[in-house]
Structures are given as C-alpha cells and as structure tokens.
Amino acid sequence: MKFLENIPSYLFFTGKGGVGKTSISCATAIRLAELGKRVLLVSTDPASNVGQVFDQTIGNTIQPVTAVSGLSALEIDPQDAAQQYRARIVDPIIGLLPDDVVNSISEQLSGACTTEIAAFDEFTGLLTDASLLTRFDHIIFDTAPTGHTIRLLQLPGAWSSFIESNPDGASCLGPMAGLEKQREQYAHAVEALSDPERTRLVLVARLQKSTLQEVARTHDELSAIGLKNQYLVINGVLPASEEKRDALAAAIWQREQEALANLPAGLSDLPTDNLYLQPLNMVGVSALKGLLNEHAEITSLPEQSPQNKPENMSLSVLVDDIARSEHGLIMLMGKGGVGKTTMAAAIAVSLADKGFNVHLTTSDPAAHLSTTLNGSLKNLQVSRINPHDETERYRQHVLETKGRDLDEAGKRLLEEDLRSPCTEEIAVFQAFSRVIREAGKRFVVMDTAPTGHTLLLLDATGAYHREIARKMGDKGHFTTPMMQLQDQERTKVLLVTLPETTPVLEAANLQSDLERAGIHPWGWIINNSLWIAQTQSPLLCQRALQERPQIEVVKNQHASRIALVPVMAAEPTGIEKLRELVV
C-alpha cells in the first residue's frame, strides 16, 4: 500500500461521506499499532463514529483503545467544544456586567460560527502540541465529509490572516479575544499542514463519477492552500472474479473499470491504492484487519440470495403520499454520499410527471445537481443556491446599507468583518429562506447539504426564528422559516441513508437532532440497496444479507414511512434513469 509507506507524523483522511474513510483510518491505526508504533486516532467529524467502530465509548480526552495495544483515540465533539468555549468567555464576566449584556454576549456565542471556532481551537491544539509527538509516533485524523473538511483545513489560514490584519476584532467574531491569545498556534498549524515531511493527506473515494469529481475538487482546493502531499485510496472496488456472476455485477464492474480508466485530471498523477469490496461491514478489529490486505480478493462465499422486494416500500408509494398534499416543501437530509441529490431529482421528476409545478433546488456546496439532472421538463424548475455567489451578494448588500455612512476606517473594519467564515452561513440561509416561501403554491424539493452543513443550516434557521420573534413581540401573527420546517402539513423532511451500520446510525442521530429542534422527519429513504436488487453474485449477496438487519432497525425503531431504492446497473443520471428509481 503506497499510502502506508514512510508515513509522517500527521495523517489526514478526507473524502465524501460514506466512502469509508473512518474504516480506512481505523484500519491504518490498527496496522501501525501492530507494527509497534504508538498511534493516536482523532475524529473531528461532527457525526463521529470511531467509538462505534471499536465498540467502545471514546470521548474528548485521549484514552487507550482496549482492543488494540498501542492505539489511543480522541473524539472532538464540536458542540461540546463550543459549550466549553462559551463558558471560558462568559463565566468571567458574570456579575461584572449587567445580566442583559451577559445574555447578549452568550447569545452571540451560540451560533454556528462559534462552534467552528471552538472545534478549530481543539484541532489546532493537537497540531501544535509538541508533547503529543513525544507520546505518539503518528497522529491520524479521521476528518469530516469533504465540504466540512475543506473549511476546517482552510480555517488556520483564514483565521491567521484575519487576526493579523484585524487586531481590534470584529463584531461577528465573539470569541476573538480568545483567538488572539493563540495567534502563534494558528501560524504553526498552517506550517504543519503544509509541510510534506510532517503531514500526508489521503483522499478516499469510491469508483463513482460524482464521488471522483468531488475528490478531484478537494485535491485542487487543498493543493491551492498548500496541502500538496496527497495520496488517493479507492475503496470498495468490486473484484474481477465477480464480473461474470450476473448482469448487475457485470454492470457495476464495467462502470467501475471505466471510472478507474478515466480518473479526473489531477487524480491520475497521485500515488493510488485500490481496496476490494468486503463481504462484511467494517465494525470491530477483526473485520478492520483484513481491509488493508492488497491480496484479499474474495475467492469463495456461500451462495445465498436475499428475499424479494417487500410490499409498500417502494419510492413510488412515498411519492404518491407526497402528491396528495398538492404543494409543500420536501427536504431531503442525510450524510454526504447517501444519494440525496439523486433522490431529490427523482422525486421532483416524478411529481412533475404527475402534472404538478415543481421547483428543485440545492444548497449542496459540491453542486451535483447539474450532473444528476441532465435534461428538462416543462413544469420543473431547477436552481442552485451557490454559496460563493450568495456570500458575495450578501457582502455587497451589507456594505451598501450598513457601510453607507461609515468613515474609511469603519468601512475597512466592516469589510474585514465580512471576510469571516461565518458570513457564508448567513448568506446561504437567507437564500434558502427565500426559496421555501414558494412552497405555499407549488412543490419545492430541496437537496440539502451533507450532515454537518445541514445541522449548521438548521442552527442558523433557529437563530433567525428567535430574532424575528424578538422583533415582532406581540404585534401580530408571523411565520418564520423555522415554524414552516416544524409544520408537517407544510414541510416533509425525508432522511436519506444507506443500508449499512454507520450511515443508519448517523441518520438516526440526525433525526434526534432534528426532533430537538421541533422538526419530525416524515419518512426515510434507504438508497443503493442490494437486498432488493436481485443479484446472483456471491459477494454482492453477502453484502445484501448484511443490509437486512439495518433495514429492520430503520423500519422498527426510526421511521414511520420507509422507501427502499435498489442499486442500479447504470448510474441514475438523466430524466429516464431517474424515472426508473420511482417504481
């Protein structure tokens, strides 16, 4: 394995959600520990599942993994980090300032921006703590899905330059004082990330066009900010021995080989390793040990076929239920890589085919929609909330309004204020709230961003709800976006997941988060199911049998409505292929 050769002190795994970077980072940590290395495995993912993989509770302090000698682990929970960060800043001023001032400061520190800063603080501390490298030979970071990872890794440079040029702080950066004390740490973190002698970045992908395109963008963006020591790992490759088993296996194998032969520009030059698709889920040390075996192609498996597709669990039944309301907001939520874009497009096309007026829109920073929906329908409008464009529009609006009467020094300060990372969150939310107003007259189908971004989006929505409620007081009736999201008559939230242990668990966690915000998911879609795909391939049959318990968990514990969507022989791009999903 190329990525395992001469590993430096820091190793980062990144990639779209669901590609297996947690499994590979855990397997790498086990491999290094078995070679006698002292290893620290760190998760900075908001939906962390390292503890689930090792069947052990892992918190925000370093602790040994009981099943693997020489391996320790740490999970950084951004929400917990934000709470501790708030306490550090607010507690010292309680009793010194009036209560309303303290409450105002606390509220300013309750948004998504503070959560990012707090998580970044912990991330930076690990990268710049020299004592850790006396305790550990390698520190492995299991990072979040691609969009979040890029932002996380860009933060050192962004905050470092922002603090350097704006020593007086800025209105939207509540915890600036705390950041100022650690300015040298940020510079050292950037230095460590950019040093190929100390840091290696492993891009993890599956042999799917959209996943490879996203990894190529990640490669370009990280290279542009100085992280050039990159390797590529392609996970879940179907072995050639399965190709002759049946039509589905042959189609999957052919599709993967074509993708491998036509890697996007930039990726083909990277040192690359391929990992075979495994018959079992990657949970537990014994399963993980076999993952990095280059010669582990499956040679013999029992011939077992999953049972037929269950009744009333097709996507068409779900769409028929949605159509009865004749209009409304349909929001698809879930971890990145589970197929939200494709499911949103399939539902939108199906509703449009039924004669309804439909607006399909996305806030996904990766912008997959244009590639997924390659065609047009008369009564289907397709749009994208572009984070970059919306941020620029928001900046200009603020400069033209709030900045109109400022002197030159004030304008410069405001411009710097608008360069902070939280500005994009505000801008995207404002665009999002404009779109959902249309749902009173037609169907609005939203393909939302991956899990971490979705939670930040909902946090922004809640903050906006509180602000409107505060301003309106008792003056009359009003409806905020949050109120619309909470109303199942007007909004149907669909959770999209895969029939695998970790994606189901993460979707269940997302459901809990939504319910705490007063939002109750209307149904679940389990995508890419082999269990209902009628395959005769022994390996694919084994994978299908692994799905059944997870489908039962969703059905019995989490979802009031459920749809199963099979793995397709051809990638579902274009209107005709999307129609085949709704059967």
Swiss-Prot record:
Record has Nucleotide-binding as a keyword: yes
GO molecular function, one term: ATPase-coupled arsenite transmembrane transporter activity
Residues where ATP binds: 15-22, 334-341
Pfam families: ArsA_ATPase
Gene3D superfamilies: P-loop containing nucleotide triphosphate hydrolases (3.40.50.300)
Enzyme Commission number(s) of this protein: 7.3.2.7
Keywords: Arsenical resistance, ATP-binding, Nucleotide-binding, Plasmid, Translocase
Domain of life: Bacteria
Reactions catalysed according to its record: arsenite(in) + ATP + H2O = arsenite(out) + ADP + phosphate + H(+)
Disulfides per UniProt: none
Family, as annotated: Belongs to the arsA ATPase family.
Function text: Anion-transporting ATPase. Catalyzes the extrusion of the oxyanions arsenite, antimonite and arsenate. Maintenance of a low intracellular concentration of oxyanion produces resistance to the toxic agents.
Protein name, entry field: Arsenical pump-driving ATPase
Lineage, broadest ranks: Bacteria, Pseudomonadati, Pseudomonadota, Gammaproteobacteria, Enterobacterales
